[in-house]
């Protein structure tokens, strides 16, 4: 059963969905609230500032008393995250997870456990931990298999190379909370507390990981309990380091839970405790507002950062761009790119990715590589005013120069880290730039010209690189002499003089 939570932020109504999972016997006796309205002073603050109770004891939430038959999972319809993706899988681990999904193992817990045991026994430490980390990630590409993370971890603990890792435990506890396996998460938590409670710093860092992991997984109960433990430490600790780390995690966690207003209150509390908020806290709040589309609040935080001596850097500027892009605010994105010149903030590959992934014309063009423009001048004729400004600002930056190596031996363009749209624009820029260099009388002509596209090891489908397909298609359509390198299938190569003849003909 779902409840709608509406919060008003600066005139913008943000609606979230809170899912309440009831057994049928419980729903026959209780009616859930279909709609809940909370101000920025309520909601998660109840969890943060009052002692939480285990579900077995009952939870009172916004006046609704819930018995031990109710479980909580936090979901939002407005998650606009700057996704780095799940932990990349090694090839061996990818094969293992594929086999774990096979029909032969379906519905047979004993067979699955034997399969997991065999995998851990036959795998090196790096591979086994890689698979576990992938399953624990809130961005995992195998969410249907994350249920087996605990079984995998249990087998790993039996390995001779196993070292107890509190960060890994925090991530596993958070996943179990998300899956509403509270007895199992409580067992792991109790063990961790027993091992770490004698060392205040280690225990605090564990709780910090627990707060952030629960917030990423969307577990209200796990987040509130870990936050309450951190508050207890803040109240009794005399260590500035311990208090700072605790506050940082609470700010980050609240922003992950779409509560940037409450996160700002924590920052104010830091000031009262004579602890100076750092750039990390401000970035968290800035992006928390931004991904919710609360741009007035986002810009207010940007201004405050400047007045307090925190320099706007590339990471911060990319957060702003990502926020605008997620809400199709292209005019604001263009204005922000122009402001960055005044801040002397350099662009990065991620700047390209954030901006170009938000340009609908370019994204649409790249769906048909047989008809997309193959020159920068041609591309500009298809763009609307907003997109044309964005492309202009990007092409005036130094990102292309940083992606190029140029000497007598080799002239190389490296497209690693670039999304398809960024690779497209950079490639068009590169052709113009290379042509310009070749036209100079004193230009050094490299023996070889190389374009590195990658072979698809990090693509959504292993071995299928959209960037490689893009480069190949454009090379064919423009009559380029560059061909796939036999020694490196993730690169295109040709003699420098041949490339000069092609571009300067």
Curated annotation (Swiss-Prot):
Per-repeat ranges for PPR: 243-277, 278-312, 313-347
Domain Smr: 413-503
Record's signal peptide: none
InterPro entries attached to this UniProt entry: Pentatricopeptide_rpt, Smr_dom, Smr_dom_sf, TPR-like_helical_dom_sf
Parts forming coiled coils: none
Pfam families, alphabetized: PPR
Domain of life of the native organism: Eukaryota
SS bond partners: none
Presence of keyword Electron transport: no
Keywords: Repeat
Family per record: Belongs to the PPR family. P subfamily.
Descriptive protein name: Pentatricopeptide repeat-containing protein At2g17033
Species lineage: Eukaryota, Viridiplantae, Streptophyta, Embryophyta, Tracheophyta
């Amino acid at each position: 059963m779902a409840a709608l939570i509406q919060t008003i932020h600066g005139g913008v109504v943000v609606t979230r969905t809170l899912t309440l999972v009831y057994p049928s016997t419980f729903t026959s006796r209780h009616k859930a609230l279909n709609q809940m309205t909370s101000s920025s002073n309520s909601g998660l603050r109840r969890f943060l500032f009052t002692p939480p109770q285990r579900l077995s004891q009952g939870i009172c939430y916004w006046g609704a008393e819930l018995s031990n038959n109710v479980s909580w999972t936090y979901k939002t319809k407005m998650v606009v995250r700057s996704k780095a993706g799940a932990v990349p899988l090694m090839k061996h681990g990818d094969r293992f997870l594929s086999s774990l999904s096979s029909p032969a193992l379906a519905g047979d817990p004993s067979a699955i456990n034997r399969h997991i045991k065999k995998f851990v026994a036959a795998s090196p430490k790096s591979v086994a931990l890689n698979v576990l980390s992938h399953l624990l990630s809130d961005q995992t590409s195998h969410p249907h298999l994350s249920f087996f993370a605990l079984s995998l971890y249990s087998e790993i603990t039996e390995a001779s190379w196993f070292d107890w890792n509190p960060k890994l435990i925090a991530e596993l506890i958070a996943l179990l909370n998300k899956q509403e396996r509270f007895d199992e998460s409580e067992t792991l938590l109790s063990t961790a507390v027993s091992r770490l409670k004698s060392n205040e710093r280690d225990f605090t860092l564990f709780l910090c990981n627990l707060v952030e992991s629960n917030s990423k997984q969307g577990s209200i109960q796990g987040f509130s309990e870990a936050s309450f433990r951190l508050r207890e430490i803040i109240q009794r600790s005399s260590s500035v380091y311990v208090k700072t780390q605790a506050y940082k995690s609470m700010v980050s966690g609240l922003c992950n839970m779409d509560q940037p207003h409450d996160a700002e209150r924590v920052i104010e509390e830091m000031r009262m405790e004579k602890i100076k908020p750092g750039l990390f806290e401000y970035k968290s709040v800035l992006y928390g507002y931004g991904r919710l589309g609360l741009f007035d609040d986002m810009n207010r935080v940007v201004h405050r950062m400047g007045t307090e001596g925190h320099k706007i850097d590339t990471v911060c500027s990319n957060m702003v761009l990502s926020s605008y892009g997620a809400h199709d605010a292209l005019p604001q994105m263009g204005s922000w790119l122009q402001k960055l010149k005044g801040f002397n903030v350099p662009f990065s590959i991620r700047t390209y990715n954030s901006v170009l992934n938000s340009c609908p014309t370019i994204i649409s063009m790249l769906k048909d590589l047989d008809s997309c423009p193959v020159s920068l001048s041609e591309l500009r004729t298809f763009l609307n005013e907003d997109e044309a400004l964005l492309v202009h600002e990007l092409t005036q930056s130094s990102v292309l120069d940083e992606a190029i190596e140029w000497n007598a031996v080799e002239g190389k363009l490296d497209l690693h880290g670039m999304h398809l749209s960024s690779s497209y624009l950079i490639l068009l820029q590169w052709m113009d730039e290379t042509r310009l260099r070749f036209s100079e009388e004193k230009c050094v002509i490299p023996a070889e010209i190389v374009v590195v596209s990658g072979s698809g090891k990090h693509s959504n489908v292993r071995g299928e690189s959209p960037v490689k397909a893009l480069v190949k298609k454009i090379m064919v359509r423009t009559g380029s002499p560059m061909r796939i390198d036999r020694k490196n299938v993730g690169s295109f190569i040709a003699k420098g003089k041949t490339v000069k003849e092609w571009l300067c003909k």
